[in-house]
């Protein structure tokens, strides 16, 4: 109802860090999102997701901006985090919601420091490390993430189209190949863990169109140091929206944009959620034309990685650890790991859709 008062992602943006790691309250929705795959010294494997969303509920106006009451409800913060225990085929998820306020939740605007109760993600300018703390009833994580190269701007200088109309877009950057180490507490045990993580930041206002059902999003790390971010915006008729795109990232941090015509995604067998009834494709084939012709097979490491979000009033989605096998035209094999997110299989994402 307040959508017209919020800023929209309309033009390419001149990103400035660390400022753009921080909050952008002039946009309605944004998120700080981290996924990764970790292993213990004994090679026990885990996947993790950690996301804090900020959702504006009051329009951005000069009158509102002058109010200094710290208890004024302007933003809601939502936490979604999960641990995929690959060895035991267990998925442990947690969610929480809070208004912004002292001791509850919030986000700084000048750098990455975002928190919801005991859960926090920060960027330390001195050490150049991202620090992440997750505290849930089932597990706790305390991680340090070290960047390999600067953030990668997706789309057109960070303007990432999600539909054909002006404003159906987000500002979006990725930070792949974050060398990760830290501590996992699970079932009264503590494990030293290490691995690779991926950070995504997006901010926007109602970026989806009414004809769109959801998206399929991939963040993949390959064993040779390359990486891939790719999303398919899915129409309600099942077709791939022309705004679908991706970014191929080379080991030195240079990147190449992939348009809708540069790839084909083919869903494979599905897993039926006993909780929501949704059918999620848990195996995919991906055919790429760029940066070189190749075919990827992407498979879930655990079938049930559905985030049931009834407690935080968002649509259910599947978010989980995957393995990747790549075969190029020379029949050379390359392996990788990453994360897959699938939305809109249970219900469409009305909160992110543009209302005219």
What is each stretch, according to the model?
Residues 2-356:
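Structured soluble/peripheral alpha/beta segments that form catalytic or ligand/cofactor-binding pockets
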């Amino acid at each position: 109802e307040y959508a017209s008062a919020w800023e929209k992602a309309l033009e390419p943006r001149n990103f400035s860090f660390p400022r753009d790691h921080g909050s952008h309250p002039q946009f309605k929705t944004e998120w700080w999102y981290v996924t990764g795959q970790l292993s213990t010294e004994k090679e026990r494997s885990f996947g993790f997701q950690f996301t804090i969303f900020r959702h504006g509920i009051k329009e951005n106006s000069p009158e509102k901006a002058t109010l200094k009451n710290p208890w004024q409800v302007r933003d809601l913060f939502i936490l979604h985090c999960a641990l995929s225990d690959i060895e035991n085929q267990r998925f442990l998820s947690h969610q929480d919601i809070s208004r912004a306020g002292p001791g509850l939740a919030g986000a700084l605007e000048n750098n990455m420091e975002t928190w919801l109760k005991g859960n926090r993600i920060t960027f330390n300018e001195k050490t150049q490390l991202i620090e992440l703390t997750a505290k849930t009833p089932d597990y706790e994580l305390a991680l340090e993430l070290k960047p390999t190269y600067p953030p990668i701007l997706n789309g057109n200088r960070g303007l990432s189209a999600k539909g054909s109309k002006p404003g159906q877009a987000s500002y979006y950057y990725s930070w792949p190949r974050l060398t990760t180490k830290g501590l996992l507490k699970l079932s009264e045990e503590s494990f030293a863990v290490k691995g690779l993580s991926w950070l995504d930041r997006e901010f926007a206002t109602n970026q989806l169109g009414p004809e769109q059902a959801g998206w399929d999003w991939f963040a993949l790390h390959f064993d040779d140091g390359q990486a891939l971010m790719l999303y398919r915006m899915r129409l309600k008729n099942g077709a791939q929206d022309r705004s679908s795109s991706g970014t191929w990232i080379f080991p030195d941090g240079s990147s190449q944009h992939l348009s809708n015509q540069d790839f084909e995604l083919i869903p494979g067998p599905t897993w039926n959620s006993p909780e929501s009834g949704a059918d999620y494709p848990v195996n995919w084939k991906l055919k790429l034309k760029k940066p070189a012709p190749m075919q990827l097979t992407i498979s879930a490491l655990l079938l049930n990685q559905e985030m049931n979000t009834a407690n935080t009033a968002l649509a259910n989605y599947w978010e989980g650890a995957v393995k990747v096998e790549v075969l190029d035209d020379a029949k050379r094999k390359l392996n990788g790991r990453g994360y897959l997110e699938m939305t809109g299989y249970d219900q469409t994402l009305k909160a992110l859709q543009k209302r005219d």
